[in-house]
Every structure is written in C-alpha cells, then in structure tokens.
C-alpha cells in the first residue's frame, strides 16, 4: 500500500551464536598470534566473533541461513552486513575512544591465520603465511584474503538471487580504505544488486566533502572492476 519493502538484515561472517561457537570453534578466524577470535574479545567487544571465509563449510552455513530467511512471507531482499574480516585497523577517528594505538598492523588484530588459510595459501604460493617475515608486506597474502572474502560474498549473494530476492551489502566507506582496514575488496563482490558504503566520515576524521570523494572512489572502483552485478 505504501511502497514499503522488507529486507532481512543478516550478519554474515560476524556470527555470535553460542551453539555455533561451541559446535564449530574451528570455523572461527585466528590472528597472527595464533589466537582464535572465538576465545578472545577483540576491542573488548563480545560480538566480535568472525567466521573464516576459506572454509567451504562456513559459506555453506551462510547459504543455508539465506535460504531460511528467504522463506519469510513478503520478504523483498536480504542485506549482508559484516561481510568482511575483523578490523585490522579501526577507522582512525575511533582510536582514542577505543583506547588503541594502531600506527601499523599488529598481530593481535591481523586475521586469518587458521590452519585452513595457511594450508590453502601454501598450496598457491609455497609458503606458510606464519613464516613470512612481514605478512603485511606480502602482496600475495593480501590478495589471497581479499579474494576469498570476495568469493564468499559472491557465493552467498548468488543464493539470494536464486531465491528470487534482491541482494545487497553494507560495505566500508571507500574501496581502498575497505581493503586496508577490513580486507574487504567490495568492488569485486559479484551477484549484488546494491552496495551501501558506510561513509561515516567522522569515524575517519574527515570533513563533509569526503562523503563525495569516497562515493566517487567507489563508483570508479566498480567501473574498473567491470563488475556486471552493479
């Protein structure tokens, strides 16, 4: 009657359900210190528990959640949020309030170094990322994480489309900041009808005009990626 659409909001890699954490602790991401985010509270946030995108079973779990949501009567679409890694670096305007110093990438917040990620990367490049002298300087290791997250996002979004629903995702502010801060290469997320960049400029210590700058960067990145979905 009023043109209102119903879209389900789905937390994607960020899954806090106790039954899931207890049943499959191996699904959760591990930092460069060997600590699982299932066991530690990142940024003192209880909900910061993140599934690893390298594991096929985590993607299948998320696909099943999509199929469940798609059964909701009157549902128009499904919106993927938290389709990323934990913040390796928080947006700059939040450092003081969260009590962190992040002048570089620190092992505590650098994910994922679980057995599956290490195994798959070694198959591709012949080295365990744990053995890299400086993982942050290894372009192949960065690209691996961007790619596996993009594949998970694309595969989950494909199921949304198969269910006949509109697919969308919340993404970080600009493509480069997103890749740097949360390992999210959203310009290469396929099968999405819409992306909604979270251009919270004050989080980045930016003035209002940066909203336009970040928007333009996003449009240009999508064009450069030749992403047919958007």
Where are each of the predicted segments found?
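Generic structural signal for hydrophobic
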Residues: 1, 62, 69-70, 189, ...
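Conserved, mostly hydrophobic/aromatic
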Residues: 6, 62, 69, 78-81, ...
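Aromatic- and acidic-residue-enriched segments that line the glycan-binding/catalytic groove
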Residues: 14-44, 83-130, 187
